[in-house]
């Protein structure tokens, strides 16, 4: 019963906290305008890239360490990870300052504190502190929104920079709050240099192999913004990025449902109540769901979208429709990939990830040479192309 209650708290907290940035979209679209929103989405790609480098999947390493080795030396791994993040983050920061890239320096600092915060959230999740986990998440999202509104109302220029600073300040403040609570509840032990070195090797051993996978996810999720920024105007990127942002609301719902259903899915596979035939049938039937969100969006009048986002965002509806198709294609993907995860086919999943990325990047390169209206098709091509491969792999595993 406690497991169900905790799961409900986690899911509710995640849904609420991840909804806050989307509730902020109409405000940001009006304050930044279409060009400013395009510029912001471009800089956010660097934040995602820096986070991969300084984070090194530490939250996953912390979770594995806790469940495999226990909590006695957990603080050792946490501190070793923080030392790594500070070291690598300082190198990135030094490059930014050397090249006088002030905005990138803010993003590097934000990535450092966001990585710190992700580790704190992982510790709470491992220790089954569902309420604390949800409170920290909600505090991070709401504080970021609050500081953003405050700064954009206080200043009239360099508004993209102010939004980035708001993200930085919220990451810093929430991390300090979470870390102070962590220190109060953690028995501090002294460790020697050799133990810290061992902990660092553990983190590197866990995180480095995942770099390629994370970079693949980055390329599929962020590379298009960089290409569009250099090939088209900031205004066109703004429309494109807004369409992707709104379609991502459906992705949140899919991820929340996936997180809630995976334990029952795995349990059904373990007890053989769920078979490969059923899994593949569900994947096929889920394809019928793919056009539904896009069709609903298609019937929503364009003037309503413009009223919601602002007069500069005429044409955003087109991008929302296309990105909704690409997003909903995640449903059959998750059904098939969860089956492979259960059977420990991580290598097969990695191969699929690399293959999808290659197809996506090639499609993106080709479509970027045409018109921006065709660029979202790269996401659909990448999402569709991987499904037959996953279907074949699940059939191979189920034999």
From Swiss-Prot:
Its main location: membrane. The keyword Signal does not apply. It is a multi-pass membrane protein. Keywords: Cell membrane, Membrane, Transmembrane, Transmembrane helix. CDD domains: MATE_Wzx_like. One of its GO terms (cellular component) is plasma membrane. The keyword Cell membrane applies. The chain crosses the membrane at residues 8-28, 36-56, 92-112, 131-151, 164-184, 199-219, 237-257, 288-308, 320-340, 349-369, 374-394. It is found in: Cell membrane. Signal peptide: none annotated. Pfam families: Polysacc_synt. Belongs to the polysaccharide synthase family. HI_0867/HI_1700 subfamily. This is Uncharacterized membrane protein PM0507. It comes from Pasteurella multocida (strain Pm70). The lineage of its organism: Bacteria, Pseudomonadati, Pseudomonadota, Gammaproteobacteria, Pasteurellales.
